[in-house]
Amino acid sequence: MIFEVENKKVFSSDIGQTFDKKKHTIILLHGSGQSHVVWSLTDQYLADQGYNVFALDLPGHGNSEGSSLRSIEEMAEWLHRVVKVIGIEDLTILGHSQGCLVALEYTSKFPDSV
């Protein structure tokens, strides 16, 4: 799936599923210098369990456009914009390595979103 945030393309592996607002959504965040590929087995498993799953490529990583973001805070703000663009209302965030820090910052800044 490719969508735009601030006029830059964002890539997300979505396992070919159609987003369903009625389902719980899980966003998977990779670590520094990685991409959605680190979640290639996990995303399929979670989708098979009935969740909407988005394994995102952060800016400057994988297939997403833009420069790498400079701080965990910037990444959390960017993630909030992604959530709004997609229209996610029922959300869990899983992170690997740096992705965990982004998930923690996001939940601290936007507790009503998770």
Question: Residue ranges of each PLM-predicted region?
Answer:
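Active-site loop/oxyanion-hole signature of alpha/beta-hydrolase fold enzymes
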Residues: D48, L58-L94
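Membrane-interface segments of envelope glycosyltransferases acting on lipid-linked substrates or membrane lipids
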Residues: F3, S32, Y51-N52, D57, ...
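Conserved HGGG/HGGXW glycine-rich cap/lid loop of the alpha/beta-hydrolase fold
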Residues: F11-N63
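Surface-exposed charge patches
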Residues: M1, Q44, R81
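Short, hydrophobic alpha-helix immediately C-terminal to the catalytic nucleophile
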Residues: S40, H80, L104-S108
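Conserved hydrolase catalytic core segment
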Residues: E89-V114
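N-terminal cap/lid segment of alpha/beta-hydrolase-fold proteins
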Residues: M1-K9
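Active-site acidic short loop of glycosyltransferases
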Residues: N7, K21-K22, G87-D90, D112
